[in-house]
């Protein structure tokens, strides 16, 4: 028997299928049923290929993608330990996710693909009103995660401790206390979220420094540059230049390798002709 606290599982029934709960109860499913469940409440003793276990880390990455209203649901709310969504068509990606999940030595690209496919499977349940309460019951996100989720949903907003507390349905003093217990503060998390978003906008999207500053909630470009330098140890412009240089070096290296492969193939061909 396998029981994983703080994790979830997704099961897919291609034919009639029976799940055994830890309390001994049997749950019956028809072919095409996709199941999302608290892994700690399921006995898994056979047909593991029908399951995809979703770790706490993966769930924590999925949670910030949701709207902050989701966090206003009380995690202690009593909900079912599993949900069922009937799919009218086969889910071809499920088998791929299951295979990737059983491989302990995934390449980086495979890890990213597995995560993306798991997110796609989780999204099937988003319209179920019990999905988010169940997710929160299982994950029980810490206050850092909940605050960052609120901030990231509107990164440019003029966030204050009181405003964030209001979004989380608690008093500012209680929020401050809970963050202190996790050895952080709302201002520290606000800076972390904005700096991480700034890096994405600079490196991936190539925004101008002024546009990045405004997009991240800074009215003063000079102050944004000051915060960025304190956080990353260099100015945004310096970071842009270094990123461009690294990209250029990688392109050059790739070009050299490609040329080497070409000439190597050409010489081999000449050798054959001789």
Curated annotation (Swiss-Prot):
Record's protein name: HTH-type transcriptional regulator GadX
Record's keyword terms, sorted: Activator, DNA-binding, Repressor, Transcription, Transcription regulation
BP GO terms, sorted: DNA damage response; DNA-templated transcription; positive regulation of DNA-templated transcription
Superkingdom in the source lineage: Bacteria
Record-annotated HTH araC/xylS-type domain positions: 145-242
Subunit structure, as described in the record: Homodimer.
Miscellaneous notes: GadX and GadW are part of a complex system required for acid resistance via the regulation of gadA and gadBC. Many of the described circuits use mutants missing one of the network components. In the wild-type situation, however, many of the scenarios are not easily observed.
Protein purpose: Positively regulates the expression of about fifteen genes involved in acid resistance such as gadA, gadB and gadC. Depending on the conditions (growth phase and medium), can repress gadW.
Induction data: Expression can be activated by RpoS and repressed by CRP, H-NS and GadW, depending on the conditions.
Range of residues in the leader sequence: none
Recorded coiled-coil stretches: none
Organism: Escherichia coli (strain K12)
GO MF, any single term: DNA-binding transcription factor activity
Alphabetized Pfam families for the sequence: HTH_18
Ranges of the DNA-binding region feature: 162-183, 209-232
């Amino acid at each position: 028997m396998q029981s994983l606290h703080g994790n979830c599982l997704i099961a897919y029934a291609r034919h009639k299928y029976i799940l055994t709960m830890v309390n001994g109860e049997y749950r019956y499913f028809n072919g095409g049923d996709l199941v999302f469940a608290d892994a700690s409440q399921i006995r898994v003793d056979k047909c593991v290929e029908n399951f995809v276990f979703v770790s706490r880390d993966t769930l924590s990455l999925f949670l910030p993608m949701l709207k902050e209203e989701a966090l206003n649901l009380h995690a202690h709310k009593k909900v079912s330990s599993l949900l069922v969504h009937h799919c009218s068509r086969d889910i071809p990606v499920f088998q791929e996710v299951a295979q990737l999940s059983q491989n302990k030595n995934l390449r980086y690209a495979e890890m990213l693909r597995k995560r993306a496919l798991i997110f796609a499977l989780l999204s099937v349940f988003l319209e179920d009103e019990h999905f988010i309460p169940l997710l929160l019951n299982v994950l029980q996100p810490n206050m850092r995660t909940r605050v960052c989720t609120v901030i990231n949903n509107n990164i440019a907003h003029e966030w204050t401790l009181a405003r964030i507390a209001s979004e989380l349905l608690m008093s500012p003093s209680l929020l401050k206390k809970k963050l202190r217990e996790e050895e952080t503060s709302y201002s520290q998390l606000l800076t972390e979220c904005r700096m991480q978003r700034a890096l994405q906008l600079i490196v991936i999207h190539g925004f101008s420094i002024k546009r990045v500053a405004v997009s991240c909630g800074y009215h003063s470009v000079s102050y944004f540059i000051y915060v960025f330098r304190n956080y990353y140890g260099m100015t945004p412009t310096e970071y842009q230049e270094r990123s461009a240089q690294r990209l250029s070096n990688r392109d050059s290296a790739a070009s050299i390798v490609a040329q080497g492969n070409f000439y190597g193939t050409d010489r081999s061909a000449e050798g054959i002709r001789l």
